[in-house]
Design a protein with these regions (language model features):
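Conserved beta-strand in the GNAT
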Residues: 51, 57-66, 72-77
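Conserved acetyl-CoA-binding loop-helix of GNAT-fold acetyltransferases
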Residues: 84-97, 119-122
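Conserved active-site alpha-helix within GNAT-family acetyltransferase domains
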Residues: 109-136
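Conserved GNAT acetyl-CoA-binding A-motif
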Residues: 97-115
């Protein structure tokens, strides 16, 4: 596996990230059309993409960092076939080489359905294991998502 770091994505890479998003994230976060995903990407400020590529040159993971409300935020998605094999940690470690602080939303409850009918497993413990702090008093609650804010800071103890 290799990780590519890019400021923009090709049409093929956007399509792969779109498929990952719709296959792996909860169904309520699904984009109906690739144009909606493209709009999402185009509205991210100062973005950087991190692509996890397998031996057959298939994109099996995508992450992006971006500026929102004067903070560096991130999103990350791995194909479920490669989850639990340290590849998510590898991408986070690569991101941490480029950032001093990160913020994100983590769904902190199990029982949410993915589009394929399988359960979405909360990644919260994964983030805690990778040095993130849970901001329990900072939540997003909507019809589409229930999540807690997570943060990471270089050399935070």
């Amino acid at each position: 596996m290799k990780i590519l770091v890019q400021e923009s994505l090709s049409a093929k890479q956007i399509e792969a990230a779109f498929r990952l998003w719709n296959n792996e994230y909860p169904e309520k976060l699904k984009f109906d059309k690739i144009e909606g995903f493209n709009d999402y990407l185009n509205n991210l400020d100062a973005k950087k993409h991190f692509l996890l590529i397998d031996a057959q040159d298939v994109i099996v993971g995508w992450s992006a960092t971006f500026l929102r409300d004067n903070e560096r935020w991130f999103a990350i998605i791995l194909n479920s076939d490669v989850q639990g094999k340290s590849y998510g940690t590898s991408i986070l470690n690569e991101i941490k080489k480029h950032e001093n602080r990160l913020a994100g939303w983590a769904i902190d409850r199990d029982g949410v359905l993915r589009a394929d009918g399988h359960m979405y497993k909360s990644p919260l413990q994964f983030y805690i294991k990778n040095g993130f702090n849970v901001q329990a008093d900072n939540r997003i609650e909507s019809e589409r998502i229930s999540a807690v804010k997570i943060t990471w800071q270089l050399n935070a103890h």
